[in-house]
Amino acid sequence: MWRIWKVFDPRRILIATAIWLIIIALTIHVILMTTERFNWLEGAPAAEYYSS
């Protein structure tokens, strides 16, 4: 396993992983915010949604 770090720079791998996780998190949040059911800022409370 230690040989892989001779090929890849650990700093670049960690930075790339962090950027990738931020992009995925923002994408998931944007998708959820565009739906009526999961938009917690403009949507109705959960009780109102499930009662209709």
Swiss-Prot record:
InterPro entries membership: Antenna_a/b, Antenna_alpha, Antenna_alpha_CS, Light-harvesting_complex
GO biological process: photosynthesis, light reaction
Location relative to the cell: Cell inner membrane
Membrane topology (Cytoplasmic): 1-12
Membrane topology qualifier: Single-pass type II membrane protein
One GO MF term: metal ion binding
GO cellular component terms, semicolon-separated: organelle inner membrane; plasma membrane; plasma membrane light-harvesting complex
Record topology, Periplasmic segments: 34-52
Top-level division of the source organism's lineage: Bacteria
Reported function: Antenna complexes are light-harvesting systems, which transfer the excitation energy to the reaction centers.
Subunit structure: The core complex is formed by different alpha and beta chains, binding bacteriochlorophyll molecules, and arranged most probably in tetrameric structures disposed around the reaction center. The non-pigmented gamma chains may constitute additional components.
Protein name per UniProt: Light-harvesting protein B800/830/1020 alpha-1 chain
